[in-house]
């Protein structure tokens, strides 16, 4: 699961809200190997997911998926798969965060936006996004 925090989600004047957490789950065949096969991608859109099983080849670059943050005008933003190239984001594992950072993510009130990778949410998000029948 890759997660992003946005302080404000306001695609239209007068609409939107403070705080937005979005994430994409990349489902792989074997996390133990150097270049696992990407089986599916499930980007979040507020409380739901879209699923690509398997992802289109032009939306994958090697072992990376191409994800964009897009406006779902007029209400909000969401993550989606894209064919466009972009920048790579550093991967920071939950275990790499300091105790203070994990504690802040666990306890900060983000309103209706919830931290997808914190202990109380992680497994539920995986279950909800499960793309395989």
Curated annotation (Swiss-Prot):
<dbReference type="GO" id="GO:0005576">
    <property type="term" value="C:extracellular region"/>
</dbReference>
<feature type="short sequence motif" description="Hepta-peptide GHRHDWE motif II">
    <location>
        <begin position="16"/>
        <end position="22"/>
    </location>
</feature>
<keyword id="KW-0843">Virulence</keyword>
<protein>
    <recommendedName>
        <fullName>NLP effector protein 14</fullName>
    </recommendedName>
</protein>
<dbReference type="InterPro" id="IPR008701">
    <property type="entry name" value="NPP1"/>
</dbReference>
<dbReference type="Pfam" id="PF05630">
    <property type="entry name" value="NPP1"/>
</dbReference>
<comment type="similarity">
    <text>Belongs to the Necrosis inducing protein (NPP1) family.</text>
</comment>
<comment type="function">
    <text>Secreted effector that contributes strongly to virulence during infection by P.capsici. Causes large necrotic areas in both host C.annuum and non-host N.benthamiana.</text>
</comment>
<keyword id="KW-0964">Secreted</keyword>
<feature type="short sequence motif" description="Conserved undecapeptide motifI I">
    <location>
        <begin position="1"/>
        <end position="9"/>
    </location>
</feature>
